[in-house]
Amino acid sequence: MALAALIAAYHESGEPGALRATLPLAGRTLVERQARLAASAGANPIVIIVERVPPALGTALERLRRDRLPLVVARTAEEAAEAIDPFDRLLLIADGAVADTDQLRSLASVQGEAVLTVPDSGYGEIYERIDGSTRWAGLATVNGALLRDTAGMLRDWDLQSTLLRRALQTGARHIAAEGPVAILDRQSDLAELERRILAGATPAGAGWAGRVLAPLERATTALTMSSPAGPQLIGLASALLTGLAAAAFLYGWLWTGLFKLLLATPLEGAALRLAKLRMQDDVRHSWWAYLLPLFSGAALVALGYALAATQGWGMILLAFVALAFLIALRVESEGRSIRFSILLAERRGMAWLMLPFGLFGLWHAGLAFLTAYSAGSFFWAQREAHSAPAAAQD
């Protein structure tokens, strides 16, 4: 049984002249967040029901289409019902309602009709009252047939409220919200949610360099989240700077190359954070994400080549050995839990480790250190990865 989503996007907000759907949230609009949450829960299609399409809403819908979300825009309940198979499960998202991904997935997995609830106390009239002790949190699951039946008798009633009432009449389960939920109506409602979204936009698997650069990455993300610049553009800038760094090293411009490398490192992190903020999970498979490791490896080899003129050809060998250990470390660590993995060698961190050696003119010693660091990290990861199974067999 497939999962579809129905998002209401027609109520006026508490802000003059603005729909709830177009309230700005984390650099985009509320309806974009809702649609991406529905997509992350596995919904296809995602039907957005509208009464009018002001420019802000039209722009938001176009951005969603560009990102290839399975979007259907319906202007009437009948159009929405036609877009959804009667045998599909339907995730109903009220106008302005948001929750985290885990709650949506959990609700979508419930068999039969279910509504997400919050306590009556502490929540205002914007949360529809269900009974004497609970209110609707703005999320529910029903079946497509119920939507078709409701569309046929709707007349002038509000679709989301009528669908909720009919689901309750059929005996829908009440499921208490286990995490933060909100129905947003004013600009002032967005501050806390936006803070949580920003705090949660940390890329998974960040090493020690990611922790050190986190404040700079967060600041860059905050500056760019409301701009037209997307993760692809910022990632492209990072890859371009890394490629230019390799070219600078090749010509012997060591400080120029290192400066470009250092500048590229927070941009990469900011691109990943912005992608997570906008729920664009495919950014790690972008072409620039594949170019970055290649350009970084080229920069390391180019540095060895530049140093070979004064330190001998062993510098090039050191660069290739360091690269080999880094690749082996990645293979050895893939899918495994390694103790102290945050301290192991990583591509972005190695650029910053060269900085103190460069300040004292010890570039050759820095390259030797990076090679030793990569080797030590690999052997530690190998020991951790293979000692645990051996201990379990004993």
Report residues per predicted region.
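N-terminal nucleotide-binding beta1-loop-alpha1 segment
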Residues: M1-A18, W380
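Conserved core of the sugar-phosphate nucleotidyltransferase
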Residues: D85-P86, A97-T170, D281-G312, S337-W352
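Conserved alpha/beta core of the MobA/IspD/sugar-nucleotide pyrophosphorylase nucleotidyltransferase superfamily
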Residues: R135-T242
